């Protein structure tokens, strides 16, 4: 419902965004902070703060950081896999999900909007 969505959004603003804000070491463009917030809401602020995207943002490379929300530096999709619950060769099996990859691509596009 719309009410539940609004409540969740307020919860994110109050609980997660102040923690996320401490991870940036410089003034952050709004589009970057918005997409970092989306990422943090989905994966946890600690994952976002420790991400390769955050490393790029804190180095002042806004576009690279935004790109890293969707792709590795090698061009492979990231943050687009789910665990299957199986373990193969001692490692958790991950399954690529096209819908998640599409979402990450959309977040990248939003993130770079208006950047210099």
Which residue stretches match the model-derived regions?
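Active-site nucleophile-His-acid catalytic modules used for acyl/amide transfer and hydrolysis
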Residues: 14-51
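Long, amphipathic alpha-helical surface segments
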Residues: 3-18, 46-116
């Amino acid at each position: 419902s719309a009410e539940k969505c609004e409540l969740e959004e307020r919860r994110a603003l109050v609980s997660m965004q102040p923690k996320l804000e401490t991870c940036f070491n410089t003034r952050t463009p709004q589009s970057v902070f918005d997409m970092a917030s989306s990422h943090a809401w989905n994966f946890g602020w600690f994952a976002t703060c420790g991400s390769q995207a955050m490393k790029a943002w804190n180095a002042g490379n806004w576009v690279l950081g935004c790109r890293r929300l969707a792709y590795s530096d090698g061009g492979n999709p990231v943050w687009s896999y789910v665990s299957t619950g199986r373990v193969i060769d001692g490692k958790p099996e991950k399954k690529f999900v096209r819908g998640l990859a599409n979402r990450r691509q959309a977040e990248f596009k939003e993130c770079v909007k208006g950047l210099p």
